[in-house]
Amino acid sequence: MCFPDGALAPRSPRAGTAGPDRALTLTAADGAVLMAHEARSASPAQVGVVVMPDVRGLHAYYRELAVRMAEVGWDAVAIDYFARTADTDDRSEGFDFMSHVQQGTPEGMALDVQAGVAHLRELGVERVFTLGFCMGGGFSWRQSAD
C-alpha cells in the first residue's frame, strides 16, 4: 500500500476547479463490469488519464485523485481491477484484496485499462495516458509497450 487508509490525495498548487465527478461502471471487452470513478475538468479537456490504483483497487484515495486530475484540467477515470472476482462495493480497509490480486491476470487488467481509455475517448479526450501506483504502476508501464 502506498498510503494509510485515511490519507488524502495531494492538491496541486496550480489547481483550479474541477467539473462534475461520479461513480460509474465500465464494461470491458470480455463483458466484465468494473467499478470506476470519472472526474471531469471544468473546461473541455484535451488530455485524459486512466488512474490505475495500488493493490487495493478503487479505494477512496484514487477516486479523490481523479478529482485532483480534473482540477488541473484533465478528464480522469480511476478504475478497479477486481470486476472478475469481487462485487462492486467498498474497497476500504476491510477489503481482502490479496485473494483477488492472486486471481487477476495481465490480460484482464489490460482489458480494464482499454475500457477506461475508450470511456475517455467517448468524452472527447484526444490524448490519454495512464498513471499507476504500486501494482498499477507496473501495469501502467506495461501499457506503454502495447
Give the positions of each predicted feature.
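N-terminal cap/leader regions of alpha/beta-hydrolase-fold enzymes
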Residues: M1-D146
